[in-house]
Regions:
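Cysteine protease-like catalytic core of ubiquitin/ubiquitin-like
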Residues: 30-36
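Short, solvent-exposed aromatic-acidic interface loops
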Residues: 18-29, 111
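Short acidic-glycine loop/turn motifs at beta-strand connectors
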Residues: 10-15, 98-101
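Short beta-strand scaffold segments in enzyme catalytic cores
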Residues: 4-9
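Low-complexity intrinsically disordered segments
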Residues: 37-182
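A sequence-level detector of short linear motifs
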Residues: 17-18, 105
Length: 182
């Protein structure tokens, strides 16, 4: 099973270039990798023109070399066209878009037997929110295992929490800066 995503870059002419990522498309997977390793205009463009990634790591060349397929990049003439593509392809559970010097993320929510398109929001806030839920799930899993000492779940939760706290501080700083400028 996989969590599919698209990584995209909004060009200055309004066109969008994007690549597909097959595994770990959720915020604490691909999202965290984008924040940690592709969080500049140059790196965001580089990751968006890869075409296809089985999974995305901090090393772009390694990610391409380890991919089981190769595909051309997807091009869209406008944001409207890109959003329509995401909405028509619900197997793409997450869409990441570099625009205005930051990553945005789109996703779906399950509603009954269907799904609702959530649109785009700032990746930092989504990563912090979903990351905290993930940490709690891992801590619950570690407790449920009833093992003595620390488990790999505890260790991953600790590592993830450090990254979440860093991005939480960054996000709060950005919000404060915007509020002061208003």
């Amino acid at each position: 099973m996989s969590t599919n995503s698209v990584v995209a870059y909004l060009r200055s002419d309004g066109a969008i270039v994007s690549s597909y990522v097959h595994y770990d498309g959720y915020e604490t997977g691909v999202g965290m990798t984008l924040l940690e390793h592709y969080n500049s205009d140059e790196r965001a463009l580089a990751v968006s023109v890869g075409g296809y990634y089985s999974s995305l790591s901090e090393d772009l060349n390694e990610s391409l070399e380890k991919s089981v397929h190769t595909e051309e990049v997807e091009m869209f003439d406008s944001m409207t066209e890109f959003e329509e593509y995401l909405m028509e392809n619900s197997h793409l559970e997450f869409g990441y878009l570099w625009t205005g010097g930051k990553w945005m993320v789109s996703s779906w929510s399950r509603i009954g037997v269907g799904a609702a398109w959530n649109g785009f929001s700032w990746l930092v806030t989504s990563f912090v929110r979903e990351g905290r839920k993930t940490v709690e799930r891992f801590r619950d899993r570690a407790r449920d295992d009833n093992r003595e000492g620390r488990t790999e779940y505890d260790e991953y939760a600790d590592e993830l929490e450090v990254t979440i706290d860093k991005w939480h501080r960054y996000g709060m700083g950005e919000i404060a800066t915007e509020a002061m400028a208003a």
